Amino acid sequence: IDMMIDDDTSIYANFLYNKYDDEELRNKEEFGSLRTGNVYAGSSEINRIRRDAEVRKRIETREIKTVILGGETLINGWFTEVQFSHSYAEENDTDNVDVTFRSDRIDTDDCGGPCGSFFYQDPQKVGLSLTSYAQGVLYADLNVDAWEEDWSLIKDTETAFSIDMTKDGFTFMDVPTTVKYGFKYRSREKKGDSNAIEVDDDDVQALLQSEFGPYIRSWPFAGQQYGPHADENLLYARKGQYTGGPDYDNFEEDFTTNEDITALYLMGTMEFDKALVIAGIRVEDTDFDTLGYNDGDVNDVLTASKSYTFVSPSLNVKYFLDDQTIIRGAIWRALSRPGFGKANLIADITERDDGNYRGEMGNPDLDPYEATNFDLSIEYYGDGSFASFGYFKKDIENAIYPLAVANTTVNGLFFDELLTFVNTDDSDVDGFELNIFQELNMLPEPFDGLFVSMNFTITDGTSSLDVDNGTVTFPFRKLSEDVSNISIGYDKNKFDVRLSYVSRSPYLDYLADDDSETIQEDLDNNNIRYTDDHTQIDFNLKYKINDNLSVKFDINNITDEPEFYYWGTPNRLSQYDEYGTTYSIGIRYNL
């Protein structure tokens, strides 16, 4: 809603409401208690094995409400913008049920030799071959191992207020200058109330898989039988029968986190004959506090707080070489605060006899990610064409990684070993980017609407972490060295069509395998997880019916490319995912 009060003043109100259900069905096959025998080039013998078959059904309701009120006016020649906003988001995850069935453990004595073999000639699609005896035991009518039900509710509330004032007509260094300054305050609270109960008593463990309508799911990978698994609808039908219903509360994953941010800024825009210079400074003050419970014990409350101030100067220069060529340069400081999920005091820690601690916990002592950034580029604007080439560099402090650490202090407690999030030491990222766009308007109609677009980025990034025996250096997290995007499209009249080829090289996903209890002293390439290179083809179509109404149709990952994760080298599988091709259609109407 927009309203003009007079020639100088207007007000507006924006409202957003969004609600949707996210339903997930998870079937999991897990082979544990493993012991291998002889190991060959593409396989290894199985001398001991056990099978778990787990089914989880989850229905989560997400709801978002946002109100934004604001206005613009002139006050003594200053163009003034005022805005107030309030938002509320809720994740209601109160429909969660999980059952795990477990086989007996068998070994070479039971099987009369090896119980089978794993084969991994194709490292992306490993397989399993079992003897007939092993199949009869592992895929028999299994007993329930555990029944679990979850109820959780996460509430996220944010209130913000800002005021910005702008005025031109100033002179600095004999150059026309526009001055802008402002203030912003943001207060956010996030609360989590998560409850879970697991039942593994004799009555539950006497239940058989055959009582849950087991079925074998179709599965595309050779050497893998997927199931039998319980019918998820029968799980929901039995909710509350074994747990006694939702009349309980625990605090294991409960938390309350608050973050208040106050910011002031001042900037000036100077208009030279052939250049535009924008210089400014921003000061942000952050107050953070969080509360949680150790291992769900309401009498063992953990609290933490942190306050810090960040000063961010910036300088941006745009220089016009001629009517078609621009050189841009910028240097600035930037801040990224730790996410609540990394800093929350959700903890499962124990005190040892020597007074030290061990366990898993968020890290409220995390410092914010800080970066000094430099960009330099040249741009060319032709008739129906565009090209740019640029260099960028980032000097980063306090990059955040998940990691198991040893002999460290977090929130005033000394840990022999802790799975948490840590700040690394210095990180560096630099690279080059090339963009090219060309309309093919020299072609005859109707082909003059065709265009070609290309983007190529080459990046090098590293992080370092001090350990007792020196410094470990590794690639910057989630950063591919090579990324490219090539598109051919058609944009004319009512049609906007694009076919894109997107490619990226491997990148570091995270440090160390949680299950291997690798601490920072043991880091090497063999226990660092990487995401393999990926290429996909996407198609996008937009059609404008009239000035108000348009439709769109998208196809993503047309060739059904998988995602592959590995430890150190591509022949050591961590995870292999097939997502398929995604189709979407939408309608947009502008009032």
Which role fits each region the language model picked out?
Residues 450, 503-518, 542-591:
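C-terminal beta-signal and adjacent terminal beta-strands/loops
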Residues 44-48, 109-146, 193-254, 406-420, ...:
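Flexible glycine-rich, low-complexity coil/linker segments exposed to the extracellular/periplasmic environment
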